[in-house]
Amino acid sequence: MKRVAVLLKTVMCEFLKCDYNGYDRIISLLRRILTLICTPNLNGLTIKRVIDSMQSLEYIKQTCNFKLQMCISSMAFKRNNALQNCNHYAWCDDHCSDIGRPMTTVRGQCSKCTKPHLMRWLLLHYDNPYPSNSEFYDLSAATGLTRTQLRNWFSNRRR
């Protein structure tokens, strides 16, 4: 039970650091759950209060999943808008090949699984978006990117 109290306290601290609208209800629910769990008379809790706290936790989970889905979908929307400009580049490539000039080299893109992993890290560390050396090492091992590539990705994302 003490672990749950520590976990909820940590979650509450994380939500307090975030600056999203609509999280006021989540913070009040977390405080209510924390006071329910930390009461010295745990045997005096009724089943209804425990069920209410579980429903509150489920509400928090659904809200967090919704916010995460909104962030991911907005990133996908930006990516789709960027892909619409590809027709212009295709025209340039055809035009350059007709003239006889060599086409420029295109740099490689991050893999599809790398970007969500890095965005998830960035969302979790919203208050301090600068990874430490050990975090760079972990991210490099997880994504397969070099430290320089990671540093460039984070600096571009923070702009």
Swiss-Prot record:
GO molecular-function terms, A-Z: DNA binding; DNA-binding transcription activator activity, RNA polymerase II-specific
Pfam assignment, any one: Homeobox_KN
Expression induction: By nitrogen starvation.
Transmembrane parts of this sequence: none
InterPro entries to which the protein is assigned, alphabetical: HD, Homeodomain-like_sf, KN_HD, TALE_homeobox
CDD domains the record matches: homeodomain (cd00086)
DNA-binding region: 103-159
Sorted UniProt keywords: DNA-binding, Homeobox, Nucleus, Stress response
PROSITE patterns cross-referenced by the UniProt entry: HOMEOBOX_2 (PS50071)
Any one of the GO CC terms: chromatin
UniProt function note: Mating type proteins are sequence specific DNA-binding proteins that act as master switches in yeast differentiation by controlling gene expression in a cell type-specific fashion. Required for meiosis, but plays no role in conjugation.
Family designation: Belongs to the TALE/M-ATYP homeobox family.
General remark: There are three genetic loci for mating type genes in S.pombe, mat1, mat2-P and mat3-M. Cell type is determined by the alternate allele present in mat1, either P (plus) in a h+ or M (minus) in a h- cell. Mat2-P and mat3-M serve as donor of information that is transposed to mat1 during a switch of mating type.
Protein name, entry field: Mating-type P-specific polypeptide Pi
